[in-house]
């Protein structure tokens, strides 16, 4: 059966978690995601054709103006994102295709050939309180491993000072345990993890940060633990690295974090080196509605302009480096708004089904 390109639409939330507060804005239906159709010249989706979309992933980042650093948020419930492809929908639905960004005529305030790259490590293994949504990763004890190393692959670092931020939790009764974080010879530590025998706290949380020059093609971080007694325990929540990186297209997909300078009356010009093989560069500041940037080529350097009204994010990529999706099967049409008024909804697991009823 021939599939009409114009009748293809993609839906999904990009994998992001819905807000915890019930009075925060949230979509009433699955959002429509803009896609790019490659090979749609004959109007039919053939074997050699493809559609591309920006899959932002389940974890998210936001810029903190107060700390002048990026902050990440791990999805509390899922490590996978799900999308729904409609192949027999109405034709040419408004907002279903990626459009060109508006040509920027504002004066250029910043010429950018570097950005603040970012990576984080966080795993969810231990729930200290056996309750809630706060989980921790690597565990320290007085008998087990007391040193954990983390390597972050960030090529083309320019040597400027970057940041390593981490958060830990610890439990030591009747003594004091120390935690240390080291990067490029600089150490941050906390020496006040100590609980009294009568304390109602299960553990104490602390944050560690170092500001240190970073160069080369990666950042190595070491977390260590000095237990105060045989019963002392500790856990790593996350380790996050941010370092100034040259804009060099070093892989099939390269993400660019825009200028931190805000100006409604000016633009920034970005310069991406070694990028002659790049097929497209999208503005993904709004992950559900990417925009296709106007590109200029100067040898192996690709340039484009963007407004500085917000902290923008971009992705440069080659078609051949796009990741494939994993098909999950077909889904019958559902009337999600036809359930009528519900007074109470209880979500549970089979083990607790009888109690929930």
Range-by-range predicted roles:
Residues 1:
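Mature N-terminal segment immediately following signal peptide/propeptide cleavage
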Residues 4-354:
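Structured catalytic cores of large enzymes
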